[in-house]
Swiss-Prot record:
Residue ranges, compositional bias (Low complexity): 439-457
Residue segments, region Disordered: 438-488, 799-831
Protein name (Swiss-Prot/TrEMBL): Tripartite terminase subunit 1
Subcellular location: Host nucleus
Function field: Component of the molecular motor that translocates viral genomic DNA in empty capsid during DNA packaging. Forms a tripartite terminase complex together with TRM2 and TRM3 in the host cytoplasm. Once the complex reaches the host nucleus, it interacts with the capsid portal vertex. This portal forms a ring in which genomic DNA is translocated into the capsid. TRM1 carries an endonuclease activity that plays an important role for the cleavage of concatemeric viral DNA into unit length genomes.
């Protein structure tokens, strides 16, 4: 099956990406090795030159007609590959003449100049223009959102020029590598996609701006965790099978690499021991009470995530791994080229200190290893702090699981006695009671706990429960009643004897005891909260470190936004030079404009139609980036407009002005603000905010006037905008252009005008059989009525034209009287119905036109 053009472009793009990754790696290699192995590079360079000459001009032409994310990326990639290939070739030629590794790397990496800054000039009118400085991918994304907000007041030629500049800046920032450089993006700055993701999840009472703070963006630069090098060491061993037989010491280096990370840490090994103990029990086995408690505590230790898992890597292991890989590489290099490798990483190690080298990482170790090392060092720093140790020891889950495991390891002679898990826990609590906690409270707590477990478990633990209760000396069952009564009597006697020796007020309230209880409760609460905060801090910093150090690919968001904006500007300019578009300004004059306005100015819109018309105003005021109204499950137009305003950073009072404009009004005298032939002419505006409000009012007049026109004349005109492709089923099209802001599709023809009401007059009137377009005579309303009645120039759309049976002079001598109050059923309205004199008799209307 033959591939189509899109599939062929995808294949070309895939091969170019493959070569781009290889070329990016060659920039960091030893130039001596490159000169020795230059044949594949020259062959690929010749292929890139051919593709650049053959495909690049066609891709550029395609993007100036209709762009897509693929064609824009291919245009950017082909030009970058052509430039970088030529640059590397020149650097290799210069190195062959004068070997200087530092000069070679400065040339291929462009270290002597900085071209990653650009200033964009935006001109809206002769008096409104701005300069915006861009330096990162986040700046480009935010600037594109602002361009979307001012899409309607930006000329298409200026918009296309700005998009071309942004594409050039993207090429300079990203280069040929799919891996984003750390200096071209800011990980803590959110984007439009982050905003949209947060709008569809529960906010839990927090505002959107507050939730965006501290969020790591994964759309401008997409995080891709890299694989661990120790996992791939087997692949390396398979690749070096031929060299292992010829280089004896390689086998020892490979075996040392494989065994380096085999040892695992025993930190918190009781968790694994608990899981091993739980595997012996299932649904059909007797479950002792201690096993149920162990399962319960293990579950809570997992879900609450209060146990720190130590990362099994040390800085010594990483250093040894780096040295072993360096020895492996140099051994292969000496065998193949007769000298050690001296690439940019070897040169860089000499210029970095210990901490900088740790964050830069190793060329042999995956970034995940560096992240694990930093996390391990952070946890170790906390562990060295006595406060953290106290918090860790106060962890209730840790204590319970540890002592239950100790109880399981301890042999029981007959399954009874005080060595069960309850007895152990109560024994520990008894020791705590000696420092201020009452034994009575602990005994009551244990009896409640034991009764709860006895209700849940029916097998294997009854005797242990009974023995535990007897050991304590108090229980809930009748068997232990005597012991409980005796213990209570002894305690009461001791308390009475002790209270007789002190002040009588102590019988009412034991202040010292209450202080101790409250102090321990407060310390326990502080310990739990503090420990949780420490764990959350470590996890947050680990995510941030992963974003900083791990691999981040350039996301498609910026190119997607540029493609949508370019297509919008291209659609707006495609009818500029079309000779088939008729300008109605050459056919009609101010009289026709005034005719339509006078027939609409005294009418009013139904109040119930304003919400739907407001949605149409939002649709026409919005740009092409946020169009969720076309999704499978569409959102309303005001939601799209809210997304556009929030991502552009519009101030709240400006949003309020937009909402008031979109709410509309039913009276035409309040929305008819555009002068004759002045639609979308903002040359008098001196400020961007004023310019934007004027644009909103022009859009409001378009929507409400067309709606009133449909209501008055019985028409069904629909409105579209040139934000995407031209709608063949719409009648009035808003182009946002100053020269021809409005188009009318009518009877197979396309008309343009700078005045809305001339287009409405064009739609209302139709050419007669001779092909002459009628014009409204300059006369009084009564004369215009008579002329329209006689001439028959206007007719209803679905009724054939018939000559009038009445002579033209018959209307002159008819006396004026009040029209009868009887109303006819509304039919398709004609100009004659509107132009009829209010006080004229109904017999004036010819029968053929009634």
């Amino acid at each position: 099956m033959e591939m189509n053009l899109l599939q062929k472009l995808c294949v070309v793009c895939s091969k170019c990406n493959e070569y781009a990754m290889e070329l990016e790696c060659l920039k960091y290699c030893d130039p001596n090795v490159l000169l020795a192995e230059s044949t594949p590079f020259k062959r690929n360079a010749a292929a890139i030159v051919y593709l650049y000459r053959k495909i690049y001009p066609e891709v550029v032409a395609q993007n100036r007609t209709q762009s897509s994310l693929l064609t824009l990326y291919l245009e950017m990639l082909l030009k970058a590959l052509h430039e970088d290939t030529a640059l590397l070739d020149r650097a290799l030629m210069a190195y062959s003449r004068q070997p200087d590794r530092a000069a070679f790397y400065r040339t291929v990496l462009r270290l002597d100049r900085c071209d990653r800054h650009h200033t964009v000039e935006l001109q809206f009118t002769d008096n409104v223009r701005f300069s915006v400085s861009l330096a990162t991918l986040n700046d480009i994304e935010r600037f594109l959102c602002k361009m979307n907000y001012v899409y309607g007041i930006l000329a298409p030629e200026a918009g296309l020029e700005v998009c071309a500049q942004l594409l050039e800046l993207l090429r300079r920032l990203c280069g040929i590598s799919p891996v984003a450089r750390q200096e071209v993006y800011v990980e803590g700055t959110t984007c439009a996609q982050c905003y949209e993701e947060l709008t569809i999840i529960p906010n839990q009472g927090r505002s959107l701006n507050k939730r965006l703070q501290g969020l790591l963006c994964n759309h401008i630069a997409v995080h891709r965790p890299s694989s661990q090098s120790d996992v791939n060491i087997q692949t390396v061993e398979q690749d070096l099978l031929d060299l292992t037989t010829r280089i004896p010491h390689l086998a020892g280096v490979l075996s040392a690499l494989k065994s380096l990370f085999s040892s695992s840490s025993a930190y918190h090994s009781y968790i694994q021991e608990a899981e091993e103990a739980l595997r012996e029990y299932n649904l059909f086995t007797d479950i002792p009470e201690r096993i149920y408690s162990l399962s319960d505590f293990t579950y809570w230790s997992r879900t609450s995530e209060v146990i720190v898992k130590r990362v099994g890597i040390t800085i010594q292991q990483l250093n040894v791994y780096h040295q072993l890989c360096r020895a492996l590489m140099n051994g292969i290099s000496r065998h193949l080229y007769g000298e050690d490798v001296e690439d940019i990483f070897v040169l860089g190690e000499k210029a970095l200190d210990g901490e900088e080298r740790m964050f830069v990482g190793s060329v042999f170790a995956a970034p995940n290893r560096i992240i694990d090392l930093i996390t391990s060092l952070s946890i170790q720093a906390f562990e060295d702090n006595p406060v953290f140790n106290k918090l860790h020891e106060s962890n209730e889950m840790y204590t319970k699981i540890k002592h239950i495991l100790e109880e399981i390891r301890r042999p029981l002679p007959d399954g009874t006695g005080g060595d069960g898990p309850e007895g152990e826990v109560i024994h520990l609590r008894g020791r705590e009671a000696m420092s201020g906690t009452g034994t009575t409270l602990m005994t009551a707590s244990n009896s409640s706990n034991s009764s709860t477990h006895s209700q849940r478990n029916n097998g294997g633990g009854g005797r242990a429960r009974g023995g535990g209760k007897k050991a304590v000396g108090g229980g809930a069952n009748g068997q232990d009643g005597d012991g409980s009564e005796n213990g209570l009597r002894v305690r009461n006697c001791d308390e009475h004897e002790a209270l007789d020796l002190v002040d009588a007020r102590s019988r009412i309230h034991n202040v010292t005891r209450e202080v101790n209880v409250r102090k321990r409760a407060y310390l326990q609460k502080v310990s739990e909260v503090g420990y949780g905060k420490v764990i959350r801090c470590i996890k947050t910093q680990e995510r941030l470190t992963s974003k900083l150090i791990d691999v981040n690919l350039v996301g498609p968001l910026c190119l997607d936004f540029i493609s949508k904006l370019m297509n919008g500007f291209l659609y707006r300019s495609q009818y500029h030079q079309d000779q088939d578009v008729v300008d109605v300004g050459n056919q009609f004059t101010y009289d026709e404009h005034l005719y339509v306005v006078n027939n609409l100015i005294h009418k009013s819109l139904p109040v119930e139609s304003l919400p739907l018309l407001g949605q149409q105003i939002y649709e026409l005021c919005n740009g092409p980036l946020f169009t969720h109204c076309t999704d499978r499950y569409p959102l309303s137009h005001n939601v799209d407009m809210a997304y556009a305003c929030d991502n552009a950073g519009v101030l709240p009072h400006v949003k309020d002005d937009l909402v008031k404009c979109a709410e509309g009004t039913v009276y035409p005298s309040e929305w008819m603000v555009v002068k004759y032939m002045g639609f979308f002419n903002f040359s008098d505006c001196q400020d961007l905010n004023v310019l934007q409000k004027e644009m909103w009012m022009h859009v409001r007049e378009l929507v409400l006037s067309v709606a009133l026109y449909n209501e008055t004349f019985g028409k069904q005109l629909s409105i579209a905008c040139l934000r995407d492709e031209l709608h063949p089923d719409r009648d009035v099209i808003l182009t946002y252009n100053k020269e021809w802001p409005l188009l009318l599709r009518h009877e197979g023809s396309l008309y343009k005008s700078k005045d809305l009401y001339l287009l409405l007059y064009r739609h209302l009137s139709r050419p007669d059989e001779s092909g002459d377009v009628p014009t409204a005579p300059v006369a009084k309303p009564s004369t215009l009525t008579a002329a329209a009645a006689v001439s028959g120039a206007f007719r209803e759309p679905d009724r054939p034209w018939l000559p009038s049976p009445y002579p033209s002079s018959s209307t002159a001598g008819v006396s004026r009287r009040v029209r009868a109050t009887r109303k006819r059923p509304r039919r398709a309205s004609s100009l004659l119905d509107l132009a009829r004199d209010e006080h004229g008799i109904q017999d004036l209307v010819p029968g053929s036109l009634r």
